[in-house]
Amino acid sequence: QSAVKTFRQDSSVIAYSQAGSSFQSFVIPERLEHFGNDEEGQLRRQAISMAIDRDQIVKKVYNNTKTPTTDFTSPLVPEYVKKLEQNGSNLKYNASKAKELWKKANAIKPWSGNFRIAYNADGGHKEWVDAVCNQIKNTLDIDAAGEPYATFSDVRNQVTNRTIKTAFRAGWMLDYPSAEDYLNPLYASSSAD
């Protein structure tokens, strides 16, 4: 049982809850049907992002012990910004816009199948993945669910070998307080290989 909802009231511990240097996300590989590097894929990615109420997840799943995403880095790094100038709206919950974008994508190619997020069951990710998938399912009216793997290495091997057939949980913890330590290892073209 998680103590995330009670640790602040526990007199046997000194409670500490500040912004950290790690983050959790999920990645949708371009090779998945409906998510290529084309207009349909871009619309679906935007719709999924806008279908997620990050504030609600932080409140309900983490009892306000996390910080909702507003940037590609952490509040601990000097380059952190609270609002991205370009595409920052993609990180804000907007169910009506998400539905509109999904409908536009369906006009290009009708949705088929399901949406899954793979995660390692040994790492405490079930709650947030389930919450994200429920929000996507309820907003976009599609079959969305988490797909548990027993261990981190089970998921990571498929990701590394590029054989995973679903979106997958990702995370990062910086080594030193610089935006480069987030951006280069995660988003540079060279980091994919």
Residue spans of the language-model regions?
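Sec-exported extracytoplasmic/periplasmic mature domains
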Residues: 8-12, 33, 49-66, 78, ...
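Ligand-binding "clamshell"
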Residues: 3-17, 164, 178-193
